[in-house]
């Protein structure tokens, strides 16, 4: 499915590497032949190959067993395969008590039903032979990510620190270390801390109950401290005595404070940018090849601390491969240096009023003005083509959309498309034929709008193609068209004033609108 660069994930959407949804399975799979009980379980690239009989044996033999349910035809499974094998090799080299295995899902329907496998690949982790409550893997699709996730389940997820030497050694080894200072290591707060440590794979965790370490770091109560070798150097999260340690609050705190005050946007940082779940992103567009542009980063960073957790400061290098970001904001590289702010929830974009010098004061003032509602958001629009109304299909842009779509004397049928969308290209002949058929009707307008280059105040377009009908009249009524995209059905829809008979078949899923890229989940092929 083609996907558009979405506002919410505008900065190249951080596909974070957890498992999401994708293609529907249905390809053939060869059923494994019967194997005699007791026969040695085969291996492929360090991975046990299991079926409904040998899975039971493997669970008895291996106290920690991860099983990948895959399909031979599944593209995502094929992409995962080398990483999965590398993870097995990493753990074997460490003599870890974890075994990795796989099951051909289509060949083993009883197992996929038992373990509620709804897509491929699905990874389940079994401990101590318990087949009733396996834990599903939702971490990165990388060898190190899989291996580290397993390490933190078969071994400690955090290091017990008993003296200053241990703390300093841990801090020296890593750029970021999270240390929980707890007076009671058997309490609920400690359990919450360890639960978080199991899944926060990009951080290293330690804990202590030693009074001298509380004193050393100026603490008088239970506190989780993030030590880092950049920016402020340290961030404290005191434990609330009344409510205790909240897993969600601590997780958000660590994500926010593990971010640099200014994050350069690239494919490596984009997952973390969106994982921070900070709704406002302030972007500084600069050309990193120019010294005078690089110097602006000092002031940009100086403005950031008061907005930590509220506004994420991001630098976009216009000299790098970031044309998609520039296009999204309607900018050209030569307009740098410049600022833009986007709310990734509403997708509203803001620009400074007039040309401003980029200083710490002006950056802070711009942020405050947007947050206080003193600056109106802007909409992207192409210029109105001189011949926009000359052909059977009328060309709309943001600047003429309201005037045409809500003309009280016209019934207007609009296709919102993306130039790269395959479904849009497939339906183009039918749309042209529809316009040709009704070109002599004064009361009907067939139009199209490139929704990647034109934004509308009235609504957002979330998939392509999106078809909307604007019937004549003063009510500004909008009817979504969700049926078959062919000339016959389009004509019935128009002739009935925007209605279709109830028995009219709906558009099959294979031709559903192509979604914009607004998911942070990685792919999984559905059953």
Swiss-Prot record:
GO MF annotation, one: protein disulfide isomerase activity
Site positions per UniProt: Contributes to redox potential value: 75-76, 422-423
UniProt subcellular location: Endoplasmic reticulum lumen
Enzymatic reactions: Catalyzes the rearrangement of -S-S- bonds in proteins
Alphabetic keyword roster: Chaperone, Disulfide bond, Endoplasmic reticulum, Glycoprotein, Isomerase, Lipid-binding, Redox-active center, Repeat, Signal, Steroid-binding
Disordered, as annotated region: 20-41, 495-527
Tissue: Highly expressed in pancreas.
Pfam families associated with the record: Thioredoxin, Thioredoxin_6
Enzyme class: isomerase
GO biological process: platelet aggregation
CDD domains: PDI_a_family (cd02961), PDI_a_PDI_a'_C (cd02995), PDI_b'_family (cd02982), PDI_b_family (cd02981)
PTM statement from Swiss-Prot or TrEMBL: Glycosylated.
Role noted for this protein: Acts as an intracellular estrogen-binding protein. May be involved in modulating cellular levels and biological functions of estrogens in the pancreas. May act as a chaperone that inhibits aggregation of misfolded proteins.
Family, similarity comment: Belongs to the protein disulfide isomerase family.
Subunit structure: Part of a large chaperone multiprotein complex comprising DNAJB11, HSP90B1, HSPA5, HYOU, PDIA2, PDIA4, PDIA6, PPIB, SDF2L1, UGGT1 and very small amounts of ERP29, but not, or at very low levels, CALR nor CANX.
Protein's recorded name: Protein disulfide-isomerase A2
Organism: Mus musculus
Lineage of the species this protein comes from: Eukaryota, Metazoa, Chordata, Craniata, Vertebrata
